[in-house]
Amino acid sequence: MASTVGVPSLYQVPHLEISKPNSKKRSNCLSLSLDKPFFTPLSLVRRTRRIHSSSLLVPSAVATPNSVLSEEAFKSLGLSDHDEYDLDGDNNNVEADDGEELAISKLSLPQRLEESLEKRGITHLFPIQRAVLVPALQGRDIIARAKTGTGKTLAFGIPIIKRLTEEAGDYTAFRRSGRLPKFLVLAPTRELAKQVEKEIKESAPYLSTVCVYGGVSYTIQQSALTRGVDVVVGTPGRIIDLIEGRSLKLGEVEYLVLDEADQMLAVGFEEAVESILENLPTKRQSMLFSATMPTWVKKLARKYLDNPLNIDLVGDQDEKLAEGIKLYAIATTSTSKRTILSDLITVYAKGGKTIVFTQTKRDADEVSLALSNSIATEALHGDISQHQRERTLNAFRQGKFTVLVATDVASRGLDIPNVDLVIHYELPNDPETFVHRSGRTGRAGKEGSAILMHTSSQKRTVRSLERDVGCHFEFISPPTVGDLLESSADQVVATLNGVHPDSIKFFSATAQKLYEEKGTDALAAALAHLSGFSQPPSSRSLLSHEKGWVTLQLIRDPTNARGFLSARSVTGFLSDLYRTAADEVGKIFLIADDRIQGAVFDLPEEIAKELLEKDVPEGNSLSMITKLPPLQDDGPSSDNYGRFSSRDRMPRGGGGSRGSRGGRGGSSRGRDSWGGDDDRGSRRSSGGGSSWSRGGSSSRGSSDDWLIGGRSSSSSRAPSRERSFGGSCFICGKSGHRATDCPDKRGF
């Protein structure tokens, strides 16, 4: 039976008290030595139950993620067979207070390992590392759940590297030619395998670590294995191939780690994993790390792990995102989302690294191509060769371009530090995908932002996602022109601060002359040009996001109104005030505020200016807005990911909104139209289709909505290589072509 380690609090002090009312033989499931404070990080709550008629006792250990080990505790990690304590009581509770983090320098690690960690700036353990350390050093099999981006690689890496280093003694064993691996790590993707390899190599450069995965030549991997290796990290498929080719022998493996075990199932590696485990030595230590625990993972643990200790840093809570990730959600349409995407990157990334996740490879190419006209962007997906993918990732890490558009191949295992922003271009297939996509930012305690793009008809689905993940979105409007100008100016100023003083000298005379002629206007013009705003930016609707349109807000005095407010009554009001506005009005949505009666609607910018010059009847107010108020929700009701019915694919009515170019539908009602519908039935019938496009046709936003679980993409055409590329190649620096088409690929 497995013990369980949960997470009730944040910190523990190196203190342990256990009451011992009786002295009985302890269980084989968990043995603790009480004369030495080796288990001080754990706050233990002992509960026992009898299995059938036997006397086997099953304890439950509860530990905090930030459990603390003192130096004395670390030195006393060995178990003692002399002290016994009672597990038969109903509850033996251990109280603990807050304490400080555990410093690497107090762990008595091998000097070479400690120095390597310090060079990397790793001075304290993260929660998952603290929770795993003691049982891992005891040799326990472990099942661990933790939030993404919390340092799981070093959680198993530090204790295993420590034991390998101590077993090798004077390191001569590390130099023995032809030695077989003692440490095996299985990962579901090439990217995760390479990340684990990098962590181990940087932490223990004196160990020979080899990473094996598909998509590259066998020769180099086989040669490395032949020379002798201490650690093998790889994907199950390639490891099976190497075993069958007799290049990889696992007869001396002492430590096994399955990283992201739940994803092994997702990518179809379950049979390969079980085949590998069947061929490993029975006497070994195994650790399984998984964000979720599907049936296959539980079965795997029962069959191949020996009395595993469950370390759960997520528990029953829904929230699985790392701390420090700010979540936003924004409603878009299929025709406007690419323009909005560029604006979101400008405002929220603030010049930092951004990863945009798409559902399909075609979308990744299209979005990357569209963004590249204004932002340095590259795509990453399964059709790109492994060599090209590695070069693209390295260039992204080095800042040669700032936006990476990727499919879910990049949502797990990518080692990309300092990602400031993650954007979900469509709703993900399920909550777990959302968590792991978002986990590319806010890693290792840093802050980051994630933005979810959705259509108006998917609003309730977003609410379902909030409940399933246990998170909260801040619903935002598209960035305004003012937001773009301010953010762009800030980024240009930051760029100017990086100009070398010697370069400034060459332009000082010209700058002085311009200043004398134009004053600060000269600098303002330079900032505008560098920001990409040589021409004034055009207005944009907050509802449809169409350029050249603006959004107005109409508020009426309920004391002077009759009946209910509806889209039809708004059109009637506009008809009386300015008939042209009624003919050209776009989307209309009612405001979701019981304290007022109001609506927002779209108009072409010039017509809106003319409308605002009209005299508005007393008791009503009409204004142009830059941020949307809460609107009545007319989205589909469903909590089932990927299982929406056909009716959910169209926005629902209810009078909440109407199509643009409302024609004269309501104009003939005259001023009484503003009085509203006389009854609820009339209001329902007037709603029709909730959101129409101008000209009376149905909105593309309704037919092309991305739904969770849906695999269809927008109806735009696939990108053509004949199409002009507006960015610059990050290899040669020249414009007009991508890195994949660069004629200068020497060393690429």
UniProtKB/Swiss-Prot annotation:
Recorded superkingdom: Eukaryota
Principal location: plastid
Residues in Helicase C-terminal domain copies: 340-485
GO cellular component terms, semicolon-separated: chloroplast; chloroplast envelope; chloroplast stroma; plastid
Positions of short motif Q motif: 102-130
Disordered, as annotated region: 621-748
Further remark: Plants with the weak allele rh3-4 exhibits albino cotyledons, pale green leaf phenotype, slow growth, short petioles, small leaves, reduced content of chlorophyll, altered structure of chloroplast ribosomes and reduced levels of chloroplast proteins.
Identification of the protein by name: DEAD-box ATP-dependent RNA helicase 3, chloroplastic
The organism's taxonomic lineage, starting at the top: Eukaryota, Viridiplantae, Streptophyta, Embryophyta, Tracheophyta
